[in-house]
């Protein structure tokens, strides 16, 4: 038993070529790509638990933070540090990376253990996001910073341009919680101020409070979005102080 990377490369040559076409990057060293696609469950079944994609995932996580951060810095010179941080967090979190992985059908190319495969592991966000980071790590080891930057330019920046405000909003509540916990060891509260309109077209107004002070008020068609909008305004107020 054991993982023969050369044999896996030979066996998966057609898959690798298909994957390279999807990401528009051709590997110099296919061993790096193959290692990025080996999930820990497969390595464990082959009695070589250490020969999985986790080390490349570690590299990819750090590289993605750097490359996405630099791309945002260059693209949005008007943005403050806090906004850049929140936007980067929204782009490199598990949910968004899993979405990016699904767009290139990454799950299909993974080597999974039988148990994980049978439990729909190819569809799990945790597995897909980690594998995506591992692929980024492999590209960095193979082609360096510029190769990863080209991938970010191709796949991430179009999303940013279309959904910048949505991405910032989606992360606002968790970011506000982190800011207040770090500064005051205490989180915010949310107060429903108004609810109006028919059941199919409700409008909610929600205020964000901290120690009885209103930091921001959001209005939207759902409570969740109103809270996020209020939290985003609260963050702007805190950052301007």
Curated annotation (Swiss-Prot):
The keyword NADP does not apply. Its main location: cytoplasm. CDD domains: DSRM_RNAse_III_family, RIBOc. Its EC number is 3.1.26.3. GO terms for molecular function: double-stranded RNA binding; metal ion binding; ribonuclease III activity; rRNA binding. Residues 16-144 form the RNase III domain. Belongs to the ribonuclease III family. NCBIfam families: RNaseIII. This is Ribonuclease 3.
